[in-house]
Design a protein with these regions (language model features):
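Conserved acetyl-CoA-binding loop-helix of GNAT-fold acetyltransferases
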Residues: 245, 251-264, 282-286
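Conserved active-site alpha-helix within GNAT-family acetyltransferase domains
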Residues: 256-257, 276-305
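Conserved GNAT-fold acetyl-CoA-binding loop/helix
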Residues: 185-211
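A short helix-loop-beta-strand connector motif used in the catalytic cores of GNAT acetyltransferases and
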Residues: 211-222, 239
Length: 312
């Protein structure tokens, strides 16, 4: 049956295109995703009120709110018999779990009664027409590394963080006073936990200017758990102006989720970091940044050396 209807959903990870034949969901792609709109009829028309679209939007709202085991809308996945077998195997990978391409290939091989390669399975995974609901983001490389996600590795990392820890990362296009106040609190907790080199009174002095910095930075990414901010990143062009994570959430991938989105989706390539904060320096080095300039004082002329780092 031709795919004749479309609608759009604004997810925390960007706009998504939904497609349907009128009865079932046949496509769900992130903006800019490889193979997006595959099989879409040239005369497909927007139709927001289709019941299956309403069901899909409801599922997506629940999913991005951290709800588990929500009944998905009706699906119709159109592909080759081999692709269909791979997609069926994907649907059996539970929420919050992961599988390697080799493990998935073994499962598909058992279904087919013959051996199949991880490469062939990977190709079919990449052609999955219904992202998120059919969990191709749960497939990892042989050593557990993130590889090959048609919607972008930063989205794969974000989806896995959502399922693992309930962390949702979004761009804050609006910055109400309550959000700014919550982020200032995250900033202070983070600074007090990591910036023990600051002189007395510096935290209070700096806190007074953080609200203006948050409101003025062009791009602001916010990581939340149960609706509460646990980290944030601000970027201006290719420069990361700020990155702070609540100390209770350090070591759980929040900073990595934010930086991955900043570098891959926003084009950020540079950052400055306090030289006296070795954990932060090591974090950026681990992500592939290297120092190219040092200043003996910070931007305000205070005695806090800065390292300017660039993504290799």
């Amino acid at each position: 049956m031709p795919v004749r209807h479309t609608t759009v959903y604004d997810s925390p990870l960007g706009e998504m295109l939904l497609a349907s034949d009128g009865q079932a969901l046949t496509g769900l792609w992130f903006e800019g995703q490889r193979h997006a709109a595959a099989g879409l009829s040239p005369d497909a028309t927007p139709r927001d009120d289709l019941p299956v679209f309403e069901a899909a939007r409801s599922w997506l709202r629940s999913y991005f709110s951290g709800e588990k085991n929500v009944e998905p809308p009706a699906l119709r996945l159109e592909g080759t018999p081999f692709q269909g077998c791979v997609w069926d195997a994907l649907r059996e990978v539970p929420y919050g779990s992961t599988v390697t391409y080799s493990e998935l290939a073994a499962r598909v091989g058992r279904r087919l009664g013959r051996a199949t390669s991880a490469r062939a399975v990977g190709s079919a995974v990449g052609r999955n027409p219904v992202s998120v609901i059919v969990g191709c983001h749960r497939v990892l490389g042989a050593r557990g590394e993130l590889t090959g996600y048609a919607g972008g590795l930063w989205r794969k990392r974000a989806l896995l963080a959502l399922e693992r820890d309930g962390v949702v990362a979004r761009e804050a296009t609006e910055r109400p006073a309550a959000l700014v106040a919550a982020l200032v609190d995250v900033w202070e907790r983070s600074v007090r936990a990591t910036h023990d080199f600051l002189l007395p009174g510096e935290v209070e002095r700096l806190r007074a200017v953080v609200p203006d910095a948050l409101e003025g930075v062009p791009r602001l990414l916010v990581a939340e758990a149960d609706g509460t901010p646990v980290g944030f990143l601000g970027a201006d062009g290719d420069f990361v102006e700020m990155l702070f994570v609540d100390p209770g959430w350090r070591g759980r991938g929040v900073g990595r989720v934010l930086m991955s989105r900043a570098t891959e989706a926003l084009g950020a390539r540079e950052v400055s970091v306090n030289e006296q904060n070795p954990q932060a320096v090591g974090f950026y080095e681990h992500l592939g940044f290297s120092a190219y300039r040092r200043t003996p004082v910070d931007d305000d002329g205070r005695p806090y050396p800065l390292l300017y780092m660039r993504l290799a």
